[in-house]
Amino acid sequence: MEEFDSEDFSTSEEDEDYVPSGGEYSEDDINELVKEDEVDGEEETQKTKGTKRKAESVLARKRKQGGLSLEEEGEEDANEESGGSSSEEEDAATGQEKGIESEDARKKKEDELWASFLNDVGPKSKVPPSTHVKTGEETEETSSSHLVKAEKLEKPQETEKVKITKVFDFAGEEVRVIKEVDATSKEAKSFFKQNEKEKPQSNISSSVPSLSAGSGLKRSSGMSSLLGKIGAKKQKMSTLEKSKLDWESFKEEEGIGEELAIHNRGKEGYIERKAFLDRVDHRQFEIERDLRLSQMKP
């Protein structure tokens, strides 16, 4: 039994490793094997070609997508740059337009304010006489109304005017300035007080008796120095004040004061216009300040 088992085992291994010789194949078997090998080779080549084509197409697509993406990114960057520059230009243009509009609006407002001021200050237009024939009753009514208005619009008593004379010293010359002021003004009161102080001094100097020759020399020198001090108390006048005084006297002599005032109130009068606009700005600031303070209070 042991021998039989060993033989069977050896024969089974031989069967597995057994390869028939070429003479044992028939022609049909050989042809079928060759065909199968060719078919397998063709399938493998087709598969390799297909995989290569797929890989090449994928790479081409990736390259195309990469190129497109790069081109798109470049276009987007260019669009962003152009958009940024155009937006900056638009912002600058809008800023300039707003500045011009605000300047024009400010000038227009100033012109309107100045025109309204001139209309209020300017001479009133005379009412043309009416051609309507008045009856007796109408004339009585109008006369009575005029009387009532005249009683209501009685002018207050005009204050008295006083002419005062001031003496100035300009470059060693005595300049006298005559001014007409109200009697109740501070300037007039100070002028009267100064005159009252100077009168007793002049009386004292005139009532001094003549003294002897020996003692008169010393006393005369003392009195002359005192009188010199009194006379030397002259207010000095500067060149600007002298030129202003000359200009005022020239306007009075020529009678052009009213004409100059009307001209200065016109559109060409820069000083009057500037002063008026400054007053308007100051008043507007005060109104805004009062509003802010009223809102801040609880």
UniProtKB/Swiss-Prot annotation:
Residues 1-158, 191-223 are annotated as: Disordered. The modification N6-methyllysine is found at residue 218. The keyword Calcium does not apply. InterPro entries: BCNT-C, Swc5/CFDP1/2. Its main location: nucleus. The modification Phosphoserine is found at residues 82, 85-86, 116, 215, 249. It is found in: Chromosome, Centromere, Kinetochore. Residues 177-216 are annotated as: Hydrophilic. The keyword Cytoplasm does not apply. May play a role during embryogenesis. This is Craniofacial development protein 1. The lineage of its organism: Eukaryota, Metazoa, Chordata, Craniata, Vertebrata. The gene is CFDP1.
